Amino acid sequence: MTEQSQPGKPASSEPATPSEPATPTEPREMTEARQAMVEKQLLPRGIADPRVIQAMKTTPRHLFLPAEAWPIAYGDHPLAIAAGQTISQPFIVAMMSELLSPLPEDAKVLEIGTGCGYQTAVLVALGYQVHSIERIAELSRGAQKTLGELDSLPAELLVGDGMLGNPPGAPYDAIISTACARKVLPAWIDQVREGGLIITPVKRFGGRQYLMRYTKQGRRLSKDDLGLVRFVPLLRGVE
């Protein structure tokens, strides 16, 4: 659930094979728009993992949006969804997914902020055991419906406070947050395994947000700063 952002990465030379329709009834223009998204937005910015490219080519972003938004569903920008939230810019979804590339395909991943379910669907397409938590029940219900129709339901879809993580499913190989925290939450550190990853935007002094990848080393976290981003804030509680 992000606003537009442009962290820099070297361009990929990976050619994009033609996209296939995500569903038997998918309009051709949606298939073509998704192919163009990969070729014009992802590859030039350095998205190179073949698994991520394939997941982005086969996950129908437009189905996570109302029909009136379909003509702009594959644009290089976030879009508004229900409850005052947004569906992330495609590049950000691809980038955050690619940051998980060191993990094995069956890794257990906790997603903080299901939103409409688009990032969730990409993670499922990558083969991860996805546990996803959303604080807004309306969004969780909508995501469950769409993901179910696409046969992309995660291992667990929960309504709850993402700041608390999901202790019953721990330990996780990675935790990925689609909302901006002021710091890495202690619950997340507790629930990720030794050597596991935490990928989250973090707000620093001055209000700027940075996408960070942390690796757990005991009670310490090593960190990689991946550049400026803009995400919706991580909030406490359940609605």
Regions found by a protein language model. Give the residues of each.
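Conserved nucleotide-cofactor-binding alpha/beta core module
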Residues: 99-222
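Polar/charged low-complexity regions in secreted precursors and cytosolic/nuclear IDRs
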Residues: 14-15, 20
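Class I SAM-dependent transferase core
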Residues: 2-9, 21-110, 121-122, 126, ...
